[in-house]
Amino acid sequence: MPQLDTSTWFTTIVAMILSLFILMQLKFHKYTYPMNPVLKALESTSFPCPWETKWTKIYSPLSLPQH
């Protein structure tokens, strides 16, 4: 049975890792990172409600006039 030749494995593995590292560096270099993130000031927007603009009266049964 022939012996497995492993003399080139080290060169192959190192070349593969080096090429993957270079490819990843090129990918990260093309990515545009956002500039310093700044928190936006949260402004509370109030929507006009119809019940805020007019006066309403609630009639309870006890306050109704007697018949």
From Swiss-Prot:
One of its GO terms (biological process) is proton motive force-driven ATP synthesis. One of its GO terms (cellular component) is mitochondrial membrane. It is a single-pass membrane protein. Keywords: Acetylation, ATP synthesis, CF(0), Hydrogen ion transport, Ion transport, Membrane, Mitochondrion, Transmembrane, Transmembrane helix, Transport. Coiled coil: none annotated. The keyword DNA-binding does not apply. The chain crosses the membrane at residues 8-24. Pfam families: ATP-synt_8. The modification N6-acetyllysine is found at K54, K57. Its main location: mitochondrion. Belongs to the ATPase protein 8 family. Component of the ATP synthase complex composed at least of ATP5F1A/subunit alpha, ATP5F1B/subunit beta, ATP5MC1/subunit c (homooctomer), MT-ATP6/subunit a, MT-ATP8/subunit 8, ATP5ME/subunit e, ATP5MF/subunit f, ATP5MG/subunit g, ATP5MK/subunit k, ATP5MJ/subunit j, ATP5F1C/subunit gamma, ATP5F1D/subunit delta, ATP5F1E/subunit epsilon, ATP5PF/subunit F6, ATP5PB/subunit b, ATP5PD/subunit d, ATP5PO/subunit OSCP. Subunit 8, of the mitochondrial membrane ATP synthase complex (F(1)F(0) ATP synthase or Complex V) that produces ATP from ADP in the presence of a proton gradient across the membrane which is generated by electron transport complexes of the respiratory chain. ATP synthase complex consist of a soluble F(1) head domain - the catalytic core - and a membrane F(1) domain - the membrane proton channel. These two domains are linked by a central stalk rotating inside the F(1) region and a stationary peripheral stalk. This is ATP synthase F(0) complex subunit 8.
